[in-house]
């Protein structure tokens, strides 16, 4: 972390608000600590750096709130797209309120947000059957510690390779 800070000329306040995520197959594999050795990072992993959201910086460390992994997919959880992220799950919060916070976090709003289906993926397994979440549900009660929240919606940034495959399959 100090090397990154020096190379990017980042002040101490900024570097303290950055978190590193190790991602594989479109899902957050783990959060990397400041002391995590670079030599331990697998070459097949992607590393994302993100600024800590405001709500996490002000979160009470003694509360039962926890961080969960989230990812985007289309039709099947194994068809992931976009950048996965970590989100603060508040204990006892109804999903309608959680969805509003997710909207702020992802930038998905209005009609686009209405098209998104939210599902819990048990154990974070790519081939697990999604357990869809309703607005009245309390997400903290539906999710175990190793579950992930999935956002099902169309991939707006399709690669040319996906188009090529689609044309040749027909």
PLM regions with names:
Residues 1-170:
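Cross-family signature of deubiquitinases and ubiquitin-like deconjugating cysteine proteases
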């Amino acid at each position: 972390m100090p090397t990154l800070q020096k190379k990017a000329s980042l002040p101490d306040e900024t570097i303290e608000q950055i978190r590193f995520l190790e991602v594989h197959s479109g899902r957050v594999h783990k959060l990397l600590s400041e002391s995590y050795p670079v030599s331990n990072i697998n070459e097949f992993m992607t590393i994302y750096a993100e600024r800590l959201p405001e709500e996490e910086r002000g979160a009470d460390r003694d509360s039962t709130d926890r961080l969960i992994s989230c990812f985007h997919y289309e039709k099947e959880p194994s068809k992931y797209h976009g950048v996965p992220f970590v989100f603060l799950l508040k204990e006892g919060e109804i999903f309608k309120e959680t969805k509003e916070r997710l909207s702020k976090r992802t930038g998905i709003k209005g009609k686009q947000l209405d098209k998104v289906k939210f599902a819990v993926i048990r154990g974070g397994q790519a081939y697990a059957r999604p357990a869809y979440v309703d607005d009245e549900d309390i997400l903290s009660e539906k999710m175990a510690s190793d579950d992930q929240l999935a956002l099902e919606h169309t991939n707006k940034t399709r690669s040319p390779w996906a188009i090529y495959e689609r044309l040749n399959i027909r």
